[in-house]
């Protein structure tokens, strides 16, 4: 597989972004082999762009689909394939040294979103002063009983925002109740990255490559009204636009670079401590230290 299909150019980076931030942002899409952030040695700061190399070309393509024109530390970033035309494989020269395309785009951010500032859409958390019980009357609540290793860890209770994303919420609700004949019970959280997210929902292949929705194999992104504003938010995992199935993730922290790319459809109302126990089983590459199983799940009626 050509290296150029695996190396991404990431431009428009804020000063706060470092290799750890980039690793956390891009690791959900696959194994990363290298991250380079060129420095300006006069200012001792990075130059506003970076290169992320994936092990597999298809993972790099998924990262482009999800991360291009997303927001990271308040800046809209560009994510494209790096195109080092004159550098041979194995060369020790940095890939940005001869690439006019990179010089053109380094440090550039998109301006389109500036006009939209000030009209921020509703966020996933409830409005200040509004009791959670008010939404519970119209929105379903579901639960998952978690087992870590061979020991019960507790229950996570979640409110599904059917008032905002009814199709996505109904898919998740039915997968919790198994009323369609299949669902989450007995499946695992196969990808866990501390300070980022815990991903599960692949009840067919159990490795992030499978799962299915109640509507068939995949369904479209419903909307992106709700945002990834903090820990305990429930969002759809995908492999690009309009590829929702059954896989989902629970955020461990604010992950605003996923806004507009993944559909947020719920939030943890009880059991955030259980989510933290799941998070503690994670690793930088996402492989859990112990098996984390959804031992039981269902709906509060």
UniProtKB/Swiss-Prot annotation:
GO biological process per UniProt: mRNA splicing, via spliceosome; positive regulation of viral genome replication; protein folding; regulation of DNA-templated transcription
Chief place of localization: nucleus
Stated consequence of mutating residue 191 to A: Expected to disrupt proline isomerase activity. Abolishes inhibition of KMT2A activity
Modification sites for Phosphoserine: 91, 97, 119
Disulfide bonds: none
Domain of life of the native organism: Eukaryota
Result after altering residue 45 to A: No effect on interaction with KMT2A
Impact after mutating residue 49 to A: Strongly decreased affinity for KMT2A. Decreased affinity for RNA
Subcellular location per the Swiss-Prot or TrEMBL entry: Nucleus
Gene3D superfamilies the UniProt entry points to: 3.30.70.330, Cyclophilin-like (2.40.100.10)
Domain PPIase cyclophilin-type, residue spans: 143-299
Reactions the enzyme catalyzes: [protein]-peptidylproline (omega=180) = [protein]-peptidylproline (omega=0)
Pfam families for the chain: Pro_isomerase, RRM_1
Domain remarks in the Swiss-Prot or TrEMBL record: The RRM domain mediates both interaction with RNA and with KMT2A (via the third PHD-type zinc-finger), but has much higher affinity for the KMT2A PHD-type zinc-finger.
Family, per entry: Belongs to the cyclophilin-type PPIase family. PPIase E subfamily.
Protein name: Peptidyl-prolyl cis-trans isomerase E
The species this protein was found in: Homo sapiens
